[in-house]
Amino acid sequence: MTYLAKPKFHHPALPKNGLGFTHRDYEGSISTLCAGCGHDSISAAIISACFELNIEPHRLAKLSGIGCSSKTPDYFLGQSHGFNSVHGRMPSVLTGANLANKQLIYLGVSGDGDSASIGLGQFMHCVRRSVNMLYVTENNGVYGLTKGQFSATADRGSKSKAGGLNNDSALDLVGLALQIGATFVARSFSGDKKQLVPLLMAGLSHPGPAFIDVISPCVAFNNHPGSTKSFEFVRAHNEAVNRLDFMDTREPITVDYEPGTSTDVTLHDGSLLKLAKLHPEYDPHDRIAAMTYMQSRAAAGELVTGLIYLDPNPRDMHAILNTVDVPLNTLSEKELCPGSSALEKINAALR
């Protein structure tokens, strides 16, 4: 993988967060993606979200697969743990890492090729097992590294840069995430940082499987007329169901809303998610209604963005498996294997 080190020099007056870190402390190496790639905007949003959340870089683990999207973890959080897996296998690696050490914050970064094709089964099982993570897909509808073939999320009827039409129906990763049990589901647009950063902050703070599908136009192969993943198309067909402000209880934040236009959602760590309702009838706590709404708007040619679903009582894999409080990778051999006498007691209890 191409690597360009970023100079460590920065202006001494850069703002610092509650831990004394600047944005530069959350950056990685210099991006080698195409100039104007939407993925770089997502990386910048992740940097902002972690800065605002006062996350200690060493407490976060970033994992990815293969593709343009999976290169991006090299461009943010250079002081964090990282693992670049094989194509489509990131969810399994993340699941294993989470089982071994639940004290880390897990961020999985993938793409529409990595998650919707070769890694589709991995993605679905990782979500249905309720792994505590934020899973982000950087969705551009094409295979950018191999010159722009349609991916599984490309809409039927969309046109490639070479002029060919896609005749296959698209996989909707948001719809799949809703069906298989994700407890936090959202969609955003790489060009809308005001919406994306609060969603990332909320997803990173969510105690369960959080999924965000980010439409991220490929400027090289899928940003032309006829593409449904281009900057122009998304801006023209973007229907946001809510506007968000994430409030970390460690810092006082004031936001002005007209009475009756917003609702507060308290997260399990005490943080507050304030939703400004742009569609009064939309309820992000109703999974079935969310799926119905998504289908109806898709049929109308609209792209729904914002917080689509939030389970007020999520459970993660460790709660379901009833694992011990301490991380499994800290247990000694004696604790893991108490000896033959303990085994004899277990066998006797089952007779």
Regions found by a protein language model. Name each.
Residues 1-144, 197-198, 326, 330-351:
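Thiamine diphosphate
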Residues 2-19, 220-351:
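Flexible, low-complexity linker and terminal segments
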Residues 35, 108-110, 184-189:
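Short catalytic-loop micro-motif centered on adjacent basic/acidic residues
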Residues 40-45, 57, 88, 92, ...:
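Conserved active-site and cofactor/substrate-binding residues in soluble primary-metabolism enzymes
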Residues 62-63, 135-139, 307-310:
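Short internal beta-strands
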Residues 117-118, 125-133, 138, 142-284:
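Glycine-rich ThDP/TPP pyrophosphate-binding loop and its adjacent helix/strand module
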